[in-house]
Amino acid sequence: MVSVYLLANFGGPRHASDIEVFLTSLLTDRDVTGKFLPPFIHKRLFSFIAKKRVAKVLPQYNCIGGFSPIYRDTEDLADTLSLYLDAPVITFHRYLPDTHQLTVQRLKAFGDCPVIGVPLFPHFTYSVTGSIVRFIHAHLPLLNISWISHFGNHPQFIFCMIDHILKFLQSHDISIHDCCLLFSAHGLPMRYINKGDPYNKHCEKSFKTISERLPNIETHLCYQSKFGPGRWLTPSTKDVCETLKTDKTYVLIVPFGFTSDHIETLYEIEKEYIPILKAREYRALRVPAIYQSPEWAASLATIIQSTPRAEKESLIKP
C-alpha cells in the first residue's frame, strides 16, 4: 500500500486580507499562547489582540511585497517532493483556516493508506509541531498517521545547512576566516521550557553539530520574535546584534529553524536586525532560508525516508 505524506507548515498571509485571519488563528491557538485562561475568554482576548496587531504588521507585509512566500514555497516543495518520493504529498497550512477543509478532504480520499506527517520545523516544540499534531488528530481521529517530530540533527539537514551557508559565502566572496554567523531561531517562553518542552535542547544540539563542522567560523546561537510579557529564551537576536564584539568584518544572520522565508526573516531580520549591525560598522547580510538551497528538496526526501516515526502521544502536551 502506498504511503501518503502530509507536509505541514505554519502558513502565512497570501495577501492583505489574510492578515487578520492568520493572526487570529495563530494567537487563539492555546498551544501557542498558553492555557492560563478559560477557552472562551482566551479566544475573545486574543481575537481582539490579533485585530489590533493588523495595523502594526500590515506595513511590514507591504514592505516585503504584501504577502508571505511561505504558502507558495510549501506548495512548490510538495510538488517537488512528490517526484522524489514517488508518492502523493498533501500540504497543511496550520494558520490558514480556509485551506483546512481541502487538506482534510484530500486525506480522507486516501482511505486507510498510511500517512507520514512531516512538519517543516527542524526542532520540536509542543507549541508548533505539537499543535499541528493535535489539530490533525482532532479532525481525523481515525487517520493512520505517524510523524517525523524533528530533524534538526539529521546528517542530511546538517549537510544541507552547511552547504547552503558555504555557497552563500562563496557567492559573496566572503572568507570563512572573516565572518561571524548568528544562527537565529524563533524564541519560546521560558514557562514552556520549564514545563519540559525540549525545543531549546534541540536547537542547542543542532547548533553545536553545525558549529563543530564549521571550525574556522565564529558562531553564536540566538532567539528572535519575542511576543508578549514574561521571560523568553536568551540571548535575543536583537541583543546579540547590539552587543556583539568580534574582529570579523562580516556578520551573517542565518535563519535557524525557519525552513522558508517569511516575515520573521524578510522583515524582522532584514529590516530590523541587519541595520543594527550595519550601524555598528559590520558588513551584515541575511542568509536566505534553506528553502532557497537547490539541495533542500532532495535532502528533505532523504530525511523523510530515514527518520524514525513518532506517535501522537509523545507529541501533544495535555
Curated annotation (Swiss-Prot):
Record-linked SUPFAM superfamilies: Chelatase
Protein name in the entry: Ferrochelatase
Residues engaged in binding Fe cation: H186, E264
Coarse class of the protein's main subcellular location: cytoplasm
Family assignment from sequence similarity: Belongs to the ferrochelatase family.
The keyword Iron appears for this protein: yes
Function: Catalyzes the ferrous insertion into protoporphyrin IX.
Keyword entries, A-Z: Cytoplasm, Heme biosynthesis, Iron, Lyase, Metal-binding, Porphyrin biosynthesis
GO cellular component, one term: cytoplasm
Compartmental location: Cytoplasm
GO molecular function per UniProt: ferrochelatase activity; metal ion binding
GO biological process: heme biosynthetic process
Signal peptide: none
